[in-house]
């Protein structure tokens, strides 16, 4: 109930703003938008209510005794198998080569920064929607959600089912402003909304977020290659990074969108292939469902009792912080939106991505973990195996040589599609908000293109350097969650106030970002600062070294950060004079703005 009460408040807020702006109503276009938004809300409400309250009460099979077989031993023991066959690795290597060739082919006509960053703004909605799936599903997604799916069942979908609450705010309030303002980057928006100082600090926050994200993805792929080939994590990360940057630095956004289209389809097909093979192995969907224990069918497993996966923590870390960051502020996401050939295509892409493809993605990334849990309950896998091994164990047990290689290729697709988006996004921010602002303001487009390519290479190298930092965490899920909870709140709060509160001042924006960053950094060393905001979630164990406190309250740090930043933003705004001499039309939410654009 907590999630739907808080999330419902955000949804209603968005609907009210959309109505006052002219986006929804009883007219033909407004009524269609109203039905769409309410349909999205109704779908998630019914689905999550069923999973939380009805599904756990349905019949469940008793835990069967594990029967050891050569196949099951090979699936769970790296020394006896677990690493595929020669055919699998031929397929995996071939996939690497195909993606590089495709990326270079589609980027061969790229001649300007407009092409490099936005692909000439010529793409249809379906291209953008499917390529966004590949960006949304990182390599970490398969592993971390399979791990949580094995431990906590269907509640692993919580991250992918939080976006309904922002649907009206994103589609009807932010998207028109973003598209018609024609900004090239998120920091540029802050520069237009306020001044160059705010733009600078927004650039710092965004670059830290995106470079860290590159590091998370490379760390994940290093873990995968360590499991499969016995490679050192760092070596595996370097190899994959070099392959990814090889086509991004050459082809830019055109290469990214076209390769991600291919990889998005690959991810969906392979993900459902895993589910289909697993359900067939068990003997049908009924057997699969019966062997998911009752608690594993809940969409919210526990509220605050388990510090490793509290639903309230996931809500604050992912639902309120990271979802806004990814959907509204992620430079890679923004560049996809702005690559559309029209606003109508942009809007269709967002709707298709959030309403149709995201629920499918939730099944794709968590499916192997659910299968592993059902297989363990059925006696096909040991129930005490490590959760981090569930993806490998389930997929190897149910697949034949060649199919396992296809699954490995899908993981590579997930990694490369996320990393290539991030690399291109970092290049855009660096060129537009750093190089042109502080290093060489009058450079030609050709020079900017060269800088963009060099930045892509540099961003990859910095991401590689970040890999050892994430190696300190127990799991990929913890590393990703702790990172996003720590770095997103200052920019998220600043953005929300900037977009929806005209009174919000430049000084308040600066204070929110700077003090927010300092406050969150302080919580690394004094985690007890988060206790009043923890909603009863246990602190958890500290890690080793100077930054050991990062592992404590790893999800609830987002609640602390959002609360502190909100308080700072409000106080400083009322302590500073309103900025009344600036025309903010088209930069903030305004009554009737959507209607004035004459769009449906």
Segments (PLM) and residue ranges:
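Cytosolic-side transmembrane helix boundary signature
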Residues: 12-30
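Membrane-embedded helix-loop-helix hairpins and adjacent transmembrane boundary segments
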Residues: 2-4, 13, 30, 34-38, ...
